[in-house]
Curated annotation (Swiss-Prot):
The gene is rpsQ. One of its GO terms (biological process) is translation. InterPro entries: NA-bd_OB-fold, Ribosomal_uS17, Ribosomal_uS17_bact/chlr. This is Small ribosomal subunit protein uS17. GO terms for molecular function: rRNA binding; structural constituent of ribosome. Keywords: Ribonucleoprotein, Ribosomal protein, RNA-binding, rRNA-binding. CDD domains: Ribosomal_uS17. GO terms for cellular component: cytosolic small ribosomal subunit. It comes from Hyphomonas neptunium (strain ATCC 15444). Part of the 30S ribosomal subunit.
């Protein structure tokens, strides 16, 4: 099965080799028919500490690296300040 890839914004990069990424998704509410935005935060493994707060990055699913880390940083998209 292919690994999931998501894009999100780095919320925190203070920990060593870890970036916390906020991923936003939109969907239509089944009853209200209104577009709803929902966000999740994921702990991603950042081997080279390249992530910077506010940066948009892609993360990929991987084998568990710690209690919370099940994602790894794949590529940087650009910076937003």
């Amino acid at each position: 099965m292919p690994k999931r890839i998501m894009k999100g914004v780095v919320v925190s990069a203070k920990q060593d080799k870890t970036a916390i990424v906020r991923v936003e998704r939109t969907f239509t509410h089944p009853m209200l028919k209104k577009i709803v935005r929902k966000t999740n935060k994921y702990h991603a493994h950042d081997e080279n500490n390249v992530a910077v707060e506010g940066q948009t990055i892609a993360i990929r699913e991987c084998a568990p690296k710690s209690k919370l880390k099940r994602w790894e940083v794949v590529a940087e998209e650009g910076t937003e300040a």
